[in-house]
């Protein structure tokens, strides 16, 4: 993304949420 660190952080959190979700469910 071309949007800065904040955008990257949001994407990272989304990926982490997906990984956690798939781990427990």
Curated annotation (Swiss-Prot):
Protein name according to UniProt: Kallikrein-like EII
Miscellaneous remark of the record: Negative results: does not have plasmin or fibrinolytic activity.
One GO molecular-function entry: serine-type peptidase activity
Tissue expression from the record: Expressed by the venom gland.
Lineage, opening ranks: Eukaryota, Metazoa, Chordata, Craniata, Vertebrata
The organism of origin for this protein: Crotalus atrox (Western diamondback rattlesnake)
One record GO biological process: proteolysis
Similarity field: Belongs to the peptidase S1 family. Snake venom subfamily.
Function noted in UniProt: Cleaves a kininogen analog to release bradykinin.
Cell compartments where the protein resides: Secreted
UniProt GO cellular component terms: extracellular region
Subunit structure, as described in the record: Monomer.
Alphabetical keyword list: Hydrolase, Protease, Secreted, Serine protease, Toxin
Regulation: Inhibited by aprotinin and PMSF, but not by EDTA.
EC number: 3.4.21.-
Domain of life of the organism encoding this protein: Eukaryota
Start and end residues of each Peptidase S1 domain: 1-25
């Amino acid at each position: 993304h071309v949007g800065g660190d904040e955008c990257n952080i949001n994407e990272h959190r989304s990926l982490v949420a997906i990984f956690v979700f798939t781990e427990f469910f």
